[in-house]
Amino acid sequence: MFHSPRRLCSALLQRDAPGLRRLPAPGLRRPLSPPAAVPRPASPRLLAAASAASGAARSCSRTVCSMGTGTSRLYSALAKTLNSSAASQHPEYLVSPDPEHLEPIDPKELLEECRAVLHTRPPRFQRDFVDLRTDCPSTHPPIRVMQWNILAQALGEGKDNFVQCPVEALKWEERKCLILEEILAYQPDILCLQEVDHYFDTFQPLLSRLGYQGTFFPKPWSPCLDVEHNNGPDGCALFFLQNRFKLVNSANIRLTAMTLKTNQVAIAQTLECKESGRQFCIAVTHLKARTGWERFRSAQGCDLLQNLQNITQGAKIPLIVCGDFNAEPTEEVYKHFASSSLNLNSAYKLLSADGQSEPPYTTWKIRTSGECRHTLDYIWYSKHALNVRSALDLLTEEQIGPNRLPSFNYPSDHLSLVCDFSFTEESDGLS
């Protein structure tokens, strides 16, 4: 079953590896062409149900869902897409199933199955956690949070035009296994995702069996709906482990700009730690993309901050905000978050020598318009109430390779960000 021991070992070592600074990691270069074809193993058992649902969704959505300009056309397109997707054929996916009636999945077994599907691909990239602890050890286990724009399948194969990425590297049946492998490798307690267009037929059914409770909020006018053979709208998804947290309240937020409702969304949930009883708010968002929309993003960010101000009762509840902000640190929306009365700090600044500089990139791709290397993804946190105990280091340029992302090694054009948080002693009275 373990066709790539190197791939297996790199995955299993990630979760409980000690927080050492930048252990040596192999610089794996992306192949210029797909590996030679070899006979593929039989379809893995745990992935079979999701594969069947995904296939049903593709076979039923064979036309472009034209969005048009009218409200009636919008809702018609949404209804058509959802009715032809796996969600309508599997209504149990529309709500989180009762975990008592759900057969759990062994994470190691699912990891083995993903590895079997990926046996012709090069091993996954090695990344290491950087120890950022400056205080005494916490009495409670840290809260591991993963932020990741996983790249909507419809956009990856359609609109995004990754000219240096072979079509074979974007095949969903293999790319979804790369995504799952990344999640299984780092085992986050909380998972914040953007560009999710396979929630109902892949992530919700599989992650719920791994013990996660999930929430999905699609974009009202998802660009995925304009792509032929789409799997429905993309949106934000938030998952948390039910054995660690209890959901206190949840809000789906459609962001506004200049009082107008926009196409961008956010999810904000207040969770209670079952072990300590402490509460905190976790939010995920994905702001408007493209150059020229800086003021629009700024307005969306201000709206999100106002919503979070209300949800956290004026910063009384500790807050973590994950997102693809589509904004460099020089943009106004970044400055709004950095100077907010919510007292937020960006976790990945702590990896820099001075603790004040963002990474040089969180996304690196080549499109028809040219090469793009930007820092767009962030994990913000309440610096008065939370400590960052460790953060997952980013891939090096050598690891990413000359053809950039996505690739046979890595499933998205954005890198995942992973941080371990603990409560400060001063935050005892805040939750």
From Swiss-Prot:
Domain of life where this protein originates: Eukaryota
Compositional bias per record (Pro residues), positions renumbered to this chain: 32-41
Listed GO MF terms: 3'-5'-RNA exonuclease activity; metal ion binding; mRNA binding; NADP phosphatase activity; NADPH phosphatase activity; poly(A)-specific ribonuclease activity
Annotated consequence of substituting E195A: Slightly increased activity as transcriptional repressor. Lack of catalytic activity
UniProt-annotated location(s): Cytoplasm; Nucleus; Cytoplasm, Perinuclear region; Mitochondrion
UniProt binding sites for Mg(2+): E195
Tissue: Adipose tissue. Expression is higher in subcutaneous adipose tissue as compared to visceral adipose tissue.
Region of interest (Interaction with PPARG), residue spans: 343-353
Keywords, comma-separated and alphabetical: Biological rhythms, Cytoplasm, Hydrolase, Magnesium, Metal-binding, Mitochondrion, Nucleus, Repressor, RNA-binding, Transit peptide
Effect of N149A: Slightly decreased activity as transcriptional repressor
Cofactor(s) this protein requires: Mg(2+)
Compositional bias per record (Low complexity), positions renumbered to this chain: 20-31
Job of this protein: Phosphatase which catalyzes the conversion of NADP(+) to NAD(+) and of NADPH to NADH. Shows a small preference for NADPH over NADP(+). Represses translation and promotes degradation of target mRNA molecules. Plays an important role in post-transcriptional regulation of metabolic genes under circadian control. Exerts a rhythmic post-transcriptional control of genes necessary for metabolic functions including nutrient absorption, glucose/insulin sensitivity, lipid metabolism, adipogenesis, inflammation and osteogenesis.
Assembly mode: Interacts with PPARG.
Homology family: Belongs to the CCR4/nocturin family.
Protein name: Nocturnin
Organism ancestry: Eukaryota, Metazoa, Chordata, Craniata, Vertebrata
